[in-house]
Amino acid sequence: MGKGGNQGEGAAEREVSVPTFSWEEIQKHNLRTDRWLVIDRKVYNITKWSIQHPGGQRVIGHYAGEDATDAFRAFHPDLEFVGKFLKPLLIGELAPEEPSQDHGKNSKITEDFRALRKTAEDMNLFKTNHVFFLLLLAHIIALESIAWFTVFYFGNGWIPTLITAFVLATSQAQAGWLQHDYGHLSVYRKPKWNHLVHKFVIGHLKGASANWWNHRHFQHHAKPNIFHKDPDVNMLHVFVLGEWQPIEYGKKKLKYLPYNHQHEYFFLIGPPLLIPMYFQYQIIMTMIVHKNWVDLAWAVSYYIRFFITYIPFYGILGALLFLNFIRFLESHWFVWVTQMNHIVMEIDQEAYRDWFSSQLTATCNVEQSFFNDWFSGHLNFQIEHHLFPTMPRHNLHKIAPLVKSLCAKHGIEYQEKPLLRALLDIIRSLKKSGKLWLDAYLHK
C-alpha cells in the first residue's frame, strides 16, 4: 500500500506543469534589477541572489539573459555543492522547441568542447600535484629569506639594496602567480581550503585583497576583452584598445591623451605605475569602502612584517621608498606578462560567442619552456587556462594538443608565439589602435 501511495505521489508531481520560456523572453531579463540565466536548459531568476554570489554580482550578472552552462562548469569545481544554491532560484525550463544555445551560438563547437572537458576529467587533469605547489611556496619563502640575508650580511649599500629589491620583486611576482592558482580553486578539492590559502598568499605575502582580486579577475575570465564587462580592458581613458574603441573615441573627438603616441607613453605610464600607484590605492580603498576587514587584516600583516624586517636597515622613510621601488619593479613584470596574452587579441563589444570561441578570440599562448613557464606562472598557456580555469597549471600543457585539434576541426585560430614576439606585439597593438584613433579623429 505504501508503494502504491508513493507511485501516486510521483505521478501527481509529474503532472505539475513546469513553466517554459523562449529565448526571446529570457533575453529581456538582462538588467541589473531583473536577471535570468540558463544552465543546462533550466531557467533561474538570480535577481536578488546575485548580491550574495561569492564571486560577486557583476560576474554572474554578465550572463543575464544568456546560457551560462559552460561558465558555470568552468568556475565551480564542485558542481553538486553549488547546485544546491540554484534549486530555490529555479523558475522553469527552456521550451522544448528552443535550442540550448542563445544568440545563434555554435552548438557543434559547444558539444565538442564539453566532450573535451569530459576527456580532461577522464585523464585526471583536474587532479592536483600538491608537491608542485608546495615547492612554489617554498621557493617564494626562500627568495624572501635570501633578500633579508643579503642586506643583513652585506649592509644597506646601493648594490646590496638593488640585489635585495630585485630578489623581493621576483618573490612578489611569483607570489602573484601562486595566489592566482588558489584564487581559481585549482589546488585543493574543497573551496574553503583554496580560499584560506589564497588569503594567506595574496594578503600576508603580497599585501593585497582576495575579494578585490576575485571581483576583478572572475569578470575578466567570464567575458574576456569585452568592453563594459571585462575590467582589464577599462583603461580609464589612458589607452584605447582594439579596433572598435579607438574609432569610437575618434568619431566622438575624445582626446584625453594623444593616443597616437600611446605606444610610446606606455613605457612611462603602464608598467611603472600600475601596481605602485593604481592597484595599491584601489586595493586599500576597496577593502575600506566594502568593509573587507578580514582581507585588510591579512594585508596589514604583510606591511607589519615588511617594515619590522627592513626599518632597522633603512629607517621608516627609507623602508617606505624601498617598498615602492619593489612594487615598481614587480609592476613591470606583471604588466608585460599579463598583457601579452590579451591586449593583442580582439577587444570589442559583446558578441555573444560560445565559451570556447570567446576564449580563443581573446587569448593567445606563448611557447613553452622551463623559463617561460616559471616567468609567466604558466600563463603562457593562457588559452588552456581560460578554457579550464580550475585545472592545476602543471597540467595545462597536457590538454593543449587536444585544444589545438579542436581549433583545427572548427577552423578557429590557435595563436602561439615566442616570448619576445609576444612582448613586442603589445607595442605593435597599441600603435595600431593609436593610428585608428588618429584617422577617425581627423577624418570621421
Curated annotation (Swiss-Prot):
<comment type="function">
    <text>Involved in the biosynthesis of highly unsaturated fatty acids (HUFA) from the essential polyunsaturated fatty acids (PUFA) linoleic acid (LA) (18:2n-6) and alpha-linolenic acid (ALA) (18:3n-3) precursors, acting as a fatty acyl-coenzyme A (CoA) desaturase that introduces a cis double bond at carbon 6 of the fatty acyl chain. Catalyzes the first and rate limiting step in this pathway which is the desaturation of LA (18:2n-6) and ALA (18:3n-3) into gamma-linoleate (GLA) (18:3n-6) and stearidonate (18:4n-3), respectively.</text>
</comment>
<feature type="transmembrane region" description="Helical">
    <location>
        <begin position="158"/>
        <end position="178"/>
    </location>
</feature>
<dbReference type="Pfam" id="PF00173">
    <property type="entry name" value="Cyt-b5"/>
</dbReference>
<feature type="topological domain" description="Cytoplasmic">
    <location>
        <begin position="327"/>
        <end position="444"/>
    </location>
</feature>
<feature type="topological domain" description="Lumenal">
    <location>
        <begin position="286"/>
        <end position="305"/>
    </location>
</feature>
<dbReference type="GO" id="GO:0002538">
    <property type="term" value="P:arachidonate metabolite production involved in inflammatory response"/>
</dbReference>
<feature type="transmembrane region" description="Helical">
    <location>
        <begin position="132"/>
        <end position="152"/>
    </location>
</feature>
<keyword id="KW-0472">Membrane</keyword>
<keyword id="KW-0275">Fatty acid biosynthesis</keyword>
<dbReference type="GO" id="GO:0043651">
    <property type="term" value="P:linoleic acid metabolic process"/>
</dbReference>
<keyword id="KW-0813">Transport</keyword>
<feature type="short sequence motif" description="Histidine box-3">
    <location>
        <begin position="382"/>
        <end position="386"/>
    </location>
</feature>
<keyword id="KW-0249">Electron transport</keyword>
<dbReference type="GO" id="GO:0036109">
    <property type="term" value="P:alpha-linolenic acid metabolic process"/>
</dbReference>
<dbReference type="GO" id="GO:0016717">
    <property type="term" value="F:oxidoreductase activity, acting on paired donors, with oxidation of a pair of donors resulting in the reduction of molecular oxygen to two molecules of water"/>
</dbReference>
<dbReference type="InterPro" id="IPR036400">
    <property type="entry name" value="Cyt_B5-like_heme/steroid_sf"/>
</dbReference>
<feature type="topological domain" description="Cytoplasmic">
    <location>
        <begin position="179"/>
        <end position="264"/>
    </location>
</feature>
<dbReference type="GO" id="GO:0005789">
    <property type="term" value="C:endoplasmic reticulum membrane"/>
</dbReference>
<keyword id="KW-0812">Transmembrane</keyword>
<dbReference type="GO" id="GO:1901570">
    <property type="term" value="P:fatty acid derivative biosynthetic process"/>
</dbReference>
<feature type="transmembrane region" description="Helical">
    <location>
        <begin position="306"/>
        <end position="326"/>
    </location>
</feature>
<keyword id="KW-0256">Endoplasmic reticulum</keyword>
<dbReference type="GO" id="GO:1900409">
    <property type="term" value="P:positive regulation of cellular response to oxidative stress"/>
</dbReference>
<dbReference type="GO" id="GO:0042759">
    <property type="term" value="P:long-chain fatty acid biosynthetic process"/>
</dbReference>
<keyword id="KW-0276">Fatty acid metabolism</keyword>
<dbReference type="GO" id="GO:0004768">
    <property type="term" value="F:stearoyl-CoA 9-desaturase activity"/>
</dbReference>
<dbReference type="InterPro" id="IPR001199">
    <property type="entry name" value="Cyt_B5-like_heme/steroid-bd"/>
</dbReference>
<protein>
    <recommendedName>
        <fullName>Acyl-CoA 6-desaturase</fullName>
        <ecNumber>1.14.19.3</ecNumber>
    </recommendedName>
</protein>
<keyword id="KW-0443">Lipid metabolism</keyword>
<dbReference type="Pfam" id="PF00487">
    <property type="entry name" value="FA_desaturase"/>
</dbReference>
<dbReference type="GO" id="GO:0006629">
    <property type="term" value="P:lipid metabolic process"/>
</dbReference>
<keyword id="KW-1133">Transmembrane helix</keyword>
<feature type="topological domain" description="Cytoplasmic">
    <location>
        <begin position="1"/>
        <end position="131"/>
    </location>
</feature>
<dbReference type="GO" id="GO:0016213">
    <property type="term" value="F:acyl-CoA 6-desaturase activity"/>
</dbReference>
<dbReference type="GO" id="GO:0016020">
    <property type="term" value="C:membrane"/>
</dbReference>
<feature type="short sequence motif" description="Histidine box-2">
    <location>
        <begin position="217"/>
        <end position="221"/>
    </location>
</feature>
<comment type="pathway">
    <text>Lipid metabolism; polyunsaturated fatty acid biosynthesis.</text>
</comment>
<dbReference type="InterPro" id="IPR005804">
    <property type="entry name" value="FA_desaturase_dom"/>
</dbReference>
<feature type="transmembrane region" description="Helical">
    <location>
        <begin position="265"/>
        <end position="285"/>
    </location>
</feature>
<dbReference type="InterPro" id="IPR012171">
    <property type="entry name" value="Fatty_acid_desaturase"/>
</dbReference>
<keyword id="KW-0444">Lipid biosynthesis</keyword>
<dbReference type="GO" id="GO:0005886">
    <property type="term" value="C:plasma membrane"/>
</dbReference>
